[in-house]
Amino acid sequence: MMTFTAGKSSAEEAKAIDVLGKAKMTVPSEFKPSEKKSRIIEHEFKVGEGDAAARLTMMRAGGGVAQNIKRWKGQFSGGKEEDQKTETVKAGPFELHLVDVTGSFAESMGGGPFFGGRTVQRENYAMVGAIFASEDGGMYFAKLVGPAETVKANREKFVEMTKSVGK
């Protein structure tokens, strides 16, 4: 479900995303709604422009937190050790797991993350991801993946967005 904040021009509107029916997450107006590339994605946004644009996806998900973090990290190879970080914070009704990874990204093409298809290596890529884990076991993912420069330039906005569920 996507709602729009009233009283702003369309260029300035922030989007409010429902997270597991427990809280709203406010998406920065600079993150532009985009066509979903997969049916399992609930919301997709474009961050940046042209070839430097990154992809922000949001969806409900299953599996454990540790398994999903391991899978996300496994999609990357190389990268500086100091850029590979995981932190956990409390945000509203969620335990929020933030994950940063850089390096060469193995992007699935055509099959989605669980169904195979061909893989394309994207050099100098980064991801900042968030797993919203609720006490009842529900999980919601937000992932920003793209050229490292774009992801790093928008990391603070992404983290603020994920923590907005606590406001």
Label each region the model flagged.
Residues 70-133:
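Signature of long, low-cysteine stretches enriched in small and polar/charged residues
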Residues 9-14:
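Boundary at the C-terminal end of the N-terminal hydrophobic targeting segment
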Residues 23-31, 136-167:
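Surface-exposed amphipathic alpha-helical segments
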Residues 18, 22, 59-67, 122, ...:
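Soluble non-cytosolic domains of exported or imported proteins
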Residues 26-79:
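Secretory pathway targeting signatures of secreted, lumenal, and periplasmic proteins
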Residues 1-7:
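Hydrophobic h-region of N-terminal signal peptides that target proteins for export
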Residues 50, 61-63, 102-106, 136, ...:
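Solvent-exposed coil/turn segments that connect beta secondary-structure elements
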Residues 20-22, 26-28, 38-42, 51-53, ...:
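Extracytoplasmic
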